[in-house]
Every structure is written in structure tokens, then in C-alpha cells.
Amino acid sequence: YGKPGATRRLREIFEELVEQGAACLDLVTPTHFTDAVLEALGGERWPVPVVWNCGGYESAETLKRLEGRVQVYLPDLKYALSEPAARYSAAADYPQVARAAILEMYRQTGPFRLDEDGMLQRGVLIRHLILPQQGENTRRVIDWVGQTFAPGQVLFSLMSQYTPVGDLAQWPE
């Protein structure tokens, strides 16, 4: 249902951001726009990193299409355990899918690289949000990252800013 010329306009927006001094092109939750993003990026390398900022539940096939176009991946790794993944996200396979996706991201980028100002230019920054009453899940996420990657290969961000909202009665824990 997109508008004709929307991909051309997206490319113009990317160009405008670069001209205005953006440090990167940060594409947030872009998976459902993969085709348009790839067309807008074209085949050339951009003067700033292209960042794929996603929830981690990505197919390796989609990620392979991004190879050479995306320099930085910012995936969430929400769950290492299937039970909370099924309960809170209706995706019991989230741990397996996200791990495979992160491995593909790393295959593409290799070890992270910062510029002289400390800005990430290439690599994978894995984020994990600590959820209430999910300490074991968090420990398993940390264990997987630590056992899978050597120091200096990926960056890891442990976030604690979760704020529950909505109908909390359905989640007594």
C-alpha cells in the first residue's frame, strides 16, 4: 500500500540526513520494509554506517540480503529460555531464531570497530532488557553471549529500564 516514489523519497531522506551530519542511518524495526530499504540504499557504500536496529527475531535469509549494506546490527536478545518467550511474546522459538540471527549478523560484520570518537562503525551490539522476575533468563542470555563470543567480538548492553504498564493483573509475577 505504499505510495509510488516512496523508495526514491526514502533515499532522499537518507541523503539529507548525511548532509545534515548524521553519525549513522539508524533504521529502527525495519524488517517489514527490507525491500524498500535495500532499494533506497542502492549498491554503493554510504559515508556513515547503516544501522539495523531490530528485535532480534529475524530470519537469517532476510539478514543475508543485507550483507554489505548494513555495517552495524543492534539486535535485542530478549530471551534465552523458551518459556518466557512463549508467555510474553508468543514466540517459543525466539531463543533459537534470535541466536541464529545474531550469529549471521556477526558473520557479516566481524568484530566491532569504533572510530576515533568512540562511535560504532561496524559490528554487533546485543541488547538485553532485564525483565521483572526473569533473572534466570537474563543469566542465560549473558551466559550465551559470553560463551559464544570472545572479548572484543561484540558489544553487550544490559538494560534495566523496563516499566510495566497496562493490565498487570494478567501477569501476577
State where each predicted segment sits.
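Conserved AdoMet/S-adenosylmethionine-binding subsite of the radical SAM
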Residues: F14-P172
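Canonical Radical SAM [4Fe-4S] cluster-binding loop centered on the CxxxCxxC motif
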Residues: Y1-P4
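Glycine-rich anion/phosphate-binding loops
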Residues: A6-R9
